[in-house]
Amino acid sequence: MDATSFILPLAEITIAGAIINASVHFVPVGGAPAAMATSTGVGTGTTQLAAGAGFTGLLAAAAMASQAGVSLSNPVHMLLIMLSGAVGAMIMLGLTMLIGQIIYVYGIGIVPAADKCEKDPITGDIQKPYITPGTTGHGIPTVCFVSGTIGAALGGLGGALAYIALQQLGFAAAIAGVLAVGFFFMNAVLASYNIGGTIEGFHDPKFKKMPNGVIASFVSSLIAGAVLIGMAMGL
């Protein structure tokens, strides 16, 4: 491979990192308080939830890329691989939020309510009267579910794009998958640091921090891309 053949994979890796970082800001993460239904969102950490969706997206993308007749040099096939990643991630996170919601509503007996908005931007439902005193919301309201689904789609797209770039660099499918997982984690952790705790979704004031996180991932992914190209060249 000559130097010019590395430009496209480097650009794809850099863009993928920025997309992954942006996706994490959409995911409704309530952390440990949400596990006790005292905070809005899913009861786990930012990185874990985003990475879970991203891994599923990577598996879906890898499955599509391995199909007979699929070529990474074909733009239509690349789009199909990326869409497969997006759909896989959306299914994973959608089911996670759905099962969590069932437990919150029927197991704990709370009404899903967002603390960071007066009305749900999607349904227009008033939120504050339904928030239990002493909590910062609970459950997964409609706006959080929609935001999480968008985040999962972006995460799946970013992860799939990184996988495509790694295969274009000549890495075997298994190695490309391992490297893509590590790459996804790197950007998810950067986003987690940028958020600084919990986030409800695109309606949360912390969502405004996203540009800083995207810039950080853009730079770090560019450096990571250069390292990966060096690995592909055998340096």
Swiss-Prot record:
One of its GO terms (biological process) is methylation. It is an enzyme of class 7 (translocase). GO terms for cellular component: cytoplasm; plasma membrane; vesicle membrane. It is a multi-pass membrane protein. Pfam families: MtrD. Keywords: Cell membrane, Membrane, Methanogenesis, Methyltransferase, One-carbon metabolism, Transferase, Translocase, Transmembrane, Transmembrane helix. The keyword Cell membrane applies. The chain crosses the membrane at residues 15-37, 49-71, 86-108, 143-165, 169-191, 212-234. Part of a complex that catalyzes the formation of methyl-coenzyme M and tetrahydromethanopterin from coenzyme M and methyl-tetrahydromethanopterin. This is an energy-conserving, sodium-ion translocating step. This is Tetrahydromethanopterin S-methyltransferase subunit D. It comes from Methanococcus maripaludis (strain DSM 14266 / JCM 13030 / NBRC 101832 / S2 / LL). The lineage of its organism: Archaea, Methanobacteriati, Methanobacteriota, Methanomada group, Methanococci. The gene is mtrD.
